[in-house]
Amino acid sequence: MKKTTRSKYRQEFSGDHVFDYKDPASLTRFIGDGGKITPSRISKLSVAQQKRVAAAVKKSRNLALLPSGSDSYDTFHRAEAISPVPFEI
């Protein structure tokens, strides 16, 4: 069986790009719908860049700059989706 290899890709960030944990707007690009950090094969980052992104996201979550947990990213249970009128019999 032939081993599958990852195709070459164009890097969007230079090798020495700094992913700042104090800028949550730029880090939300690397967070999926469920609140998980996207893998490098989807975000097209190198191994070193993926490690730096993961560390920045974790640090930002610890400082409460980014929400942690899947409940924060869930669109079904948002307050505006729930009716404010109580159920009547």
Curated annotation (Swiss-Prot):
SUPFAM superfamilies reported in the protein's UniProt record: Ribosomal protein S18
This protein's UniProt keywords: Ribonucleoprotein, Ribosomal protein, RNA-binding, rRNA-binding
InterPro entries: Ribosomal_bS18 (IPR001648), Ribosomal_bS18_sf (IPR036870)
An individual GO BP term: translation
Domain of life assignment: Bacteria
One GO CC annotation: ribonucleoprotein complex
GO molecular function terms listed in the Swiss-Prot or TrEMBL record: small ribosomal subunit rRNA binding; structural constituent of ribosome
HAMAP family: Ribosomal_bS18
NCBIfam families: S18 (TIGR00165)
Role, per record: Binds as a heterodimer with protein bS6 to the central domain of the 16S rRNA, where it helps stabilize the platform of the 30S subunit.
Family, as annotated: Belongs to the bacterial ribosomal protein bS18 family.
Subunit structure: Part of the 30S ribosomal subunit. Forms a tight heterodimer with protein bS6.
Protein's recorded name: Small ribosomal subunit protein bS18
